[in-house]
Amino acid sequence: MKRTYQPSKLKRNRTHGFRARMATKNGRQVLNRRRAKGRKRLTV
């Protein structure tokens, strides 16, 4: 059986990266929540 997690840096960044988050209103809300919480890393 093939494992479900097949790492790819490109896919990771396109789906969860900073530019991807900034592209949508909800993504920006995610970033703002994480900033408010004081996360060291905002994305990936």
UniProtKB/Swiss-Prot annotation:
Protein name: Large ribosomal subunit protein bL34
Entry's family note: Belongs to the bacterial ribosomal protein bL34 family.
Keywords annotated in UniProt: Ribonucleoprotein, Ribosomal protein
Alphabetical list of Pfam families matching this protein: Ribosomal_L34 (PF00468)
NCBIfam families for the chain: rpmH_bact
Source organism: Coxiella burnetii (strain Dugway 5J108-111)
Annotated GO biological process: translation
One GO molecular-function entry: structural constituent of ribosome
Listed Basic residues bias regions: 1-19, 31-44
Single GO cellular component term: ribosome
Region called Disordered, residue ranges: 1-44
Domain of life of the native organism: Bacteria
Lineage start: Bacteria, Pseudomonadati, Pseudomonadota, Gammaproteobacteria, Legionellales
